[in-house]
């Protein structure tokens, strides 16, 4: 009797697990193998062209994927433009005057449409472009799971609430990532995306003038192009990784150990807290960092995708069909 009850419970749990993972389970690395076999080459060509013109664009495309996935899943909602009757996510605090690369995705979408019209989603193009950006800048490669569809809606409040700001505490970072099904280790690994790219003065001003857990010479260097007065030089840029700002490597973590994290939300990863040991691991074992980063990217790409008959395949990424 006990064993049969146990069997029923096991089967029930199995069914629950099947339903819980059904969306991401419908994603596959060969989703377009028959319907659009040239999708990878087409996207890569577009990314290479954009990054060759401006290496920072690689970081911007990677960040675009993160900002998309953290708001109702990886559904290209971040690309939807505001209209007189529709408010998208682009004016949210984490995105306004900040997200970049939308025009690059639009251009790539046009190229993909010319090869196989109405087949590949904008959401999948963002995912592939993020991977290609990492590879082009010297980072790891991985097989991108595909089959996402594009949303017909967006969430301004979701963008404002779900994406952690640069002032985040460690506990806030952990909770924001946990809310998306990502572990603390995933969070530390994915924060390594800050090995490339730049940040605006307004996002690190408080750190370089008010915080004590910062290398003094580093702070002075940053202060030279980021005045203390709010409203002055707000959009002046500084590299997130002072050492190798356009190369994907583990210097981001080395900087943290030397108290040279640019953002408050960077340095909290190495400030006497629970994530210090992971930062040290990534400093001493770059291969562990890259493998964890890849695992985190795949996991992030699995966040509540629209699949099957859900959503749509947009003809133009900035608007619903």
From Swiss-Prot:
Record: residues binding heme b: 194
Active site (UniProt): 67
Residues reported to bind substrate: 164
Group of enzyme by EC: oxidoreductase
One GO molecular-function entry: heme binding
Cofactor(s) listed: heme b; Ca(2+)
Cofactor note: Binds 1 heme b (iron(II)-protoporphyrin IX) group per subunit.
Function: Removal of H(2)O(2), oxidation of toxic reductants, biosynthesis and degradation of lignin, suberization, auxin catabolism, response to environmental stresses such as wounding, pathogen attack and oxidative stress. These functions might be dependent on each isozyme/isoform in each plant tissue.
Descriptive protein name: Peroxidase 4
EC number: 1.11.1.7
Glycosylation site positions: 210
GO cellular component: extracellular region
Family: Belongs to the peroxidase family. Classical plant (class III) peroxidase subfamily.
Binding site for Ca(2+) 2: 195, 241, 244, 249
């Amino acid at each position: 009797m006990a064993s049969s009850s146990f069997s029923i419970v096991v089967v029930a749990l199995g069914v629950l697990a099947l339903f819980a993972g059904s969306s991401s389970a419908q994603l596959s690395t060969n989703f377009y193998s028959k319907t659009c076999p040239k999708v990878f080459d087409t996207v890569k060509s577009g990314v290479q062209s954009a990054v060759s013109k401006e290496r920072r664009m690689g970081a911007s495309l990677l960040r675009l994927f993160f900002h998309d996935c953290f708001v109702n899943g990886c559904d290209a909602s971040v690309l939807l433009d505001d209209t007189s009757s529709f408010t998208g996510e682009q004016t949210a605090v984490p995105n306004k005057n900040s997200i970049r690369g939308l025009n690059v995705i639009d251009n790539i979408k046009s190229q993909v449409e010319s090869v196989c019209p109405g087949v590949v989603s904008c959401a999948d193009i963002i995912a592939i472009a993020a991977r290609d950006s990492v590879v082009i800048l010297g980072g790891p490669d991985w097989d991108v799971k595909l089959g996402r569809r594009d949303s017909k809606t967006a969430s301004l409040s979701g963008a404002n609430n779900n994406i952690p700001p640069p002032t985040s505490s460690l506990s806030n970072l952990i909770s924001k990532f946990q809310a998306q099904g990502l572990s603390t280790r995933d969070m530390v690994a994915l924060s390594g995306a800050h090995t490339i790219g730049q940040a605006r003065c307004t996002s690190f001003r408080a750190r370089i003038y008010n915080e004590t857990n910062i290398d003094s010479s580093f702070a002075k260097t940053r202060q030279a192009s980021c005045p203390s007065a709010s409203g002055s030089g707000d959009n002046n840029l500084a590299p997130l990784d002072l050492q190798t700002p356009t190369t994907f490597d583990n210097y981001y973590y080395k900087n943290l150990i030397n108290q040279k994290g640019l953002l408050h939300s960077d340095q909290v990863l190495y400030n006497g807290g629970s994530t210090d040991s992971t930062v040290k691991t990534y400093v001493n074992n770059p291969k562990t960092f890259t493998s964890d980063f890849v695992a985190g990217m795949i996991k992030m790409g699995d966040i509540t995708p629209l699949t099957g008959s859900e959503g749509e395949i947009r003809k133009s990424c900035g608007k619903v069909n």
